[in-house]
Amino acid sequence: MQTYLGACTELGLADITAETVGAPQAILIEGYVWDIAEGPALARKAVDIARGNGTAIALSLSDSFCVERHRESFEEFVRDGADIVVADEDEINALLETDNFDDSLRALDDYQNLFAMTRSAKGSVIVSGAEMVVQPADGVEDVLDTTGAGDAWCAGFLYGWVNHRSLNDCARYGTHCASQVIQQLGARIEPGLLDELQSL
């Protein structure tokens, strides 16, 4: 994958302030930030500010190659920076240095985080301590474009989480968002999708 990092490459430590971080229920940090020079320091500063506001920290692992490039730093951040880790199957396997998803699930016993993991057509798995939720993928016949499916899933999941819904509901919301995005060209979510989530 050749990801264009865009405006985040211009971020500096001076840009991460109490005003820019604010006091939301959660912030999402993309793993791709680690690909810029000050990335880890930017993430740490955002975490320090957010923690002071009682804000939860979600980390998206972005892609498996990104994980391989920064595995040790990601591992450290997952251990002491992130409350929620969002990843697909390849990304979580890369982080935990396993060859298959079942081994990764077993390895999660050593972590305290909430892990929200997608498995493409196999659906998603949420692990929080002893609780595990397995959510099947929606049956979509006409898949046009999978660009943004993981991001849409993450958005739906976090929407449920910040609204204090059950992990089952969070997984359903993520699945619904992803299933809508893959039926269109491009990753832009239609405005009516929020209304659909609220009616699920």
Residue map of PLM features:
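Conserved beta-alpha-beta core of the PfkB/ribokinase-like small-molecule kinase fold
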Residues: 26-106, 122-124
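Conserved phosphate-binding/catalytic region of the ribokinase-like
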Residues: 10, 48-52, 72, 98-200
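Short, acidic/turn-prone active-site loops that include or flank metal/cofactor-
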Residues: 4-8, 90-91, 138-141
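Residues that scaffold the ATP/ADP-binding catalytic core of kinase and kinase-like folds
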Residues: 2, 95, 181
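Thr-Gly-centered strand-to-loop micro-motif
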Residues: 2, 29-30, 60-61, 143, ...
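A residue-level structural signature of the nucleotidyltransferase/glycosyltransferase Rossmann-like core
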Residues: 8, 83-84, 93, 114-116
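Conserved phosphate-binding/catalytic loop of the ribokinase/pfkB sugar-kinase fold
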Residues: 1-40
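Structured loop/turn residues at beta-strand edges in well-structured enzyme cores
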Residues: 19-22, 80, 110
